[in-house]
Design a protein with these regions (language model features):
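Hydrophobic, aromatic-enriched interface-forming segments
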Residues: 42-87
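Active-site metal-binding core of divalent-cation-utilizing nuclease and nuclease-like domains
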Residues: 53-59, 79-118, 131
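Short His-Asn-centered micro-motif
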Residues: 81-83, 115, 125-128, 156-160
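Hydrophobic beta-strand segments of well-ordered beta-sheets in folded domains
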Residues: 77, 121-124, 151-158, 176-178
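Domain-level recognition of nuclease-like catalytic cores that cleave nucleotide substrates
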Residues: 148-149, 159-202
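Conserved catalytic cores of phosphodiester-cleaving nucleases, focusing on short active-site segments
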Residues: 64, 68, 75, 92, ...
Length: 202
């Protein structure tokens, strides 16, 4: 079509072919734009409608916001969440700084950071589909950038399912938590002394 348009230049057929070419191109652009928008994953964060780009990692982050937070961090504010394409989808620099964060360009934020103001708790959450659980080394890295933070710190690794959790179980640090998106009502606590004790009969 492009070649035919060029060949028709300076001829009577040029205007007609140009019109047909532009119409076809506009339809093509609309088609691919629509497809791209359909692939995005809508998510509501801090009462704001946003979109994650497609992918397993972002699917898990979406589950953290929509399923973990209401169950285990009710009324929490999302201070940070990344995206596989747009690195910082949400980053409340002012609030993070007020809480005592020291963030440099070299620091790698956890995938999701939630803050519960009523309890003064911060949830650091790594969404793991292939790499990056809350290992002892990762805890040290986060502690370094949060030396000035006085709020209570909770370290969580989120996995999509049990099989992924089992792959990384030996890397996980003690005194951290695990959440599985396939079993959203439950947590795995890697620090028995704090939660050990009989439960009331149901």
């Amino acid at each position: 079509e492009t070649l035919e348009l060029i060949q028709a230049y300076n001829t009577e057929a040029y205007v007609e072919r140009l019109s047909a070419y532009l119409k076809a191109r506009e339809t093509l652009v609309e088609k691919y734009t629509s497809k791209k928008q359909m692939e995005m994953m809508p998510v509501k964060i801090n009462q704001e409608e946003l979109n994650f780009s497609p992918g397993k990692h972002n699917e898990l982050q979406k589950a953290i916001i929509e399923n973990f937070a209401p169950r285990f961090a009710p009324n929490a504010e999302c201070l940070y969440v990344g995206d596989t394409i747009k690195k910082d989808l949400i980053k409340n620099v002012e609030k993070l700084s007020n809480l005592g964060f020291e963030i440099t360009l070299h620091d790698k934020m956890p995938d999701v950071v939630l803050y519960c103001e009523d309890k003064n708790w911060i949830y650091f959450i790594e969404a793991v589909t292939s790499v990056g659980p809350m290992s002892p080394q990762r805890i040290i890295e986060i502690e370094e950038m949060t030396k000035g933070v006085k709020a209570g710190k909770i370290y969580i690794t989120a996995f999509p399912d049990f099989s992924t959790y089992k792959k990384f179980s030996e890397e996980l640090a003690w005194e951290t938590e695990v959440w599985l998106s396939e079993l959203p009502d439950h947590m795995i606590h890697l620090n028995g002394d704090k939660f050990m004790g009989p439960r009331e009969k149901r």
